[in-house]
Amino acid sequence: MSKTHLTEQKFSDFSLHPKVVEALEKKGFHNCTPIQALALPLTLAGRDVAGQAQTGTGKTMAFLTSMFHYLLSHPAIADRKVNKPRALIMAPTRELAVQIHADAEPLAEATGLKLGLAYGGDGYDKQLKVLESGVDILIGTTGRLIDYAKQNHINLGAIQVVVLDEADRMYDLGFIKDIRWLFRRMPPANQRLNMLFSATLSYRVRELAFEQMNNAEYIEVEPEQKTGHRIKEELFYPSNEEKMRLLQTLIEEEWPDRAIIFANTKHRCEEIWGHLAADGHRVGLLTGDVAQKKRLRILDEFTRGDLDILVATDVAARGLHIPAVTHVFNYDLPDDCEDYVHRIGRTGRAGASGHSISLACEEYALNLPAIETYIGHSIPVSKYNPDALMTDLPKPLRLTRPRTGNGPRRTGAPRNRRRSG
């Protein structure tokens, strides 16, 4: 975590449980990020928190630190049964749930509190086996959580701490009824510590906080630009015919160490993957159609650096904690203004710099005015020379289901192509 991203406030300055402080310092966390410095005084005093912060600013560690401290400082209810977790974290996607679980593991190891995962699409029996052994903290997506609850594999009657992460995304994905169903199975709001975190605190998110929390304190950490001042933004206006060639030319020019390319549909993502894989790039595909085990494998390969490029739909736009993403390409301008912010927020995280390149084609250029109004500034426009676009491109690979595979390893040096001045 970059020092420029941190405050002078140290975790050791708070009256945190010693085991929590020890675990944080062992992982190299000494100073708080702004959202952590704002949230911890409130949660340590037992106050509910609804927090807004740009992605990559330490929201996850803010609620995990608060949760572990609370559970260590407050006894579990008497005669708690093995199927009753003490804390629940709800996440909108499987990937985010898995990432939160990974972030929580060092704290769990240091404190002895047990973790459980519950997400759909994979591992029903494996997850259930862990739950049946008893967990203190359950992390999951709403559909699988409800499934286990209806089967009496879990009972939420002993919940002492609850976290709703990426609350705005929960609304976008249509999970609000599931969330309310789960809340109704918990003790009343004034008998638990409640935390909600979101990239935006819209009216509907605040309404949810009012319904399900106990007089929550609202905290916000937002840069002057919604997109973050460390992200260089750039916009091109290609024709539909030149769009793919422009993307491939830009990739050859930029030769990014680690890039994510976003498109608006899974079919467009598959098309992009086919072109890049055929051209020798180490590229992975992440859409809703990709099987869970392969999704996790692809994310792991991308995080390790075995893949240079990830092509993704907005299912992957939030909650991905991938370090050192250097470039984000918006192959399609998103229909939702907030998705633009979340997409390019994959780069320039935790104080690092990043580069976002957007293609405003004939089909999606109409989304640009609303995006620029939302972010509060115009995206700088760059020109390109159509005659300098790559032409020596191989025939794209076709995706054979259920394969989601990776392209061949990137070889050689980037080809030299120049933009117009």
Curated annotation (Swiss-Prot):
Gene designation: rhlB
GO aspect biological process, one term: RNA catabolic process
Gene3D superfamilies per the UniProt record, alphabetical: P-loop containing nucleotide triphosphate hydrolases
Name of the protein in question: ATP-dependent RNA helicase RhlB
GO cellular component: cytosol
Binding of ATP, residues: A53, Q54, T55, G56, T57, G58, K59, T60
Low complexity: bias regions: 402-414
Subunit description: Component of the RNA degradosome, which is a multiprotein complex involved in RNA processing and mRNA degradation.
Function: DEAD-box RNA helicase involved in RNA degradation. Has RNA-dependent ATPase activity and unwinds double-stranded RNA.
Keywords: ATP-binding, Cytoplasm, Helicase, Hydrolase, Nucleotide-binding, RNA-binding
Family: Belongs to the DEAD box helicase family. RhlB subfamily.
Organism expressing this protein natively: Shigella dysenteriae serotype 1 (strain Sd197)
Superkingdom as given in the UniProt entry: Bacteria
